[in-house]
């Protein structure tokens, strides 16, 4: 666990980067279902990261230190403001425990309440809930929209639920004054033109990586959705295949060509009537072009892709029927309404 004793803002920013990394990276202790989802941080309006010590004997007291940053209108993160946390709780607890805490401020009003007043009491008008874990929980809209504040607590390396109702985030004015070398309020740090300090660059690298992860994941999801929609659209556009199939012959039957040729070709499907006048003419074979791709579903079907040119061996007068053709040395039947005459 990290040191909860208040220190200078440079040390607090370094500690915050370390804590956030421990809450978001997959390790032997933290599996994919035990990390803060990237979309939670990428969509947050503000973020408070602290180390907290809790001591109890009949009544528990909580105190600690950390920083808070806010999301600026351009999507970047503000300079950090030093904060403390304090609170009392009931319950029969004896002992001392040090925990790391990440508080997600989901709405602008939560950030503004702290920035304008210098203090923010969790609970009351700002509902608090234990935040979701794992990488696939963004679809839980009810959970995402129900709480103004998400909390994450890790004690002894393990995530644990924590009640922060009644706890107060407190502006550490003197720490901010020493770091920024001027009297400056939290509001001016979080919403003003205060540049991001180089001392907190590690923290910003981690925060910016979540936006990148979220955007990349969003692009992958959108690509998968588009592919599914394309497949659905293509499936809807495919014409219905003929219902009845010709019966396959148990023995080959020679195809009557109707010409002087000594062709030694055999008709696979004697039940399929032939158009002998043109089909049997070697000088002018009938060719059709595939309008759609067809993947055979039974032995003897002729596979082809849209754009393939198929030589017709035998056909009927109907396009809503099965014809026989040859493509790349393979012979088989195919739905005639998947092709067009050349």
Swiss-Prot record:
Domain SH3: 283-342
Protein's recorded name: SH3 domain-containing YSC84-like protein 1
InterPro entries to which the protein is assigned, alphabetical: SH3-like_dom_sf, SH3_domain, SH3_domain_YSC84-like, SH3YL1_SH3, SYLF_SH3YL1-like, Ysc84_actin-binding
Coiled coil stretches, renumbered: none
Start-end of Basic and acidic residues biased regions: 226-239
Sequence similarity: Belongs to the SH3YL1 family.
A Pfam family this chain is assigned to: Ysc84
Quaternary context: Interacts with SH3D19.
Annotated GO CC locations: ruffle membrane
Gene Ontology biological process terms from the UniProt entry: regulation of ruffle assembly
Keywords of the record: SH3 domain
A GO MF label: phosphatidylinositol binding
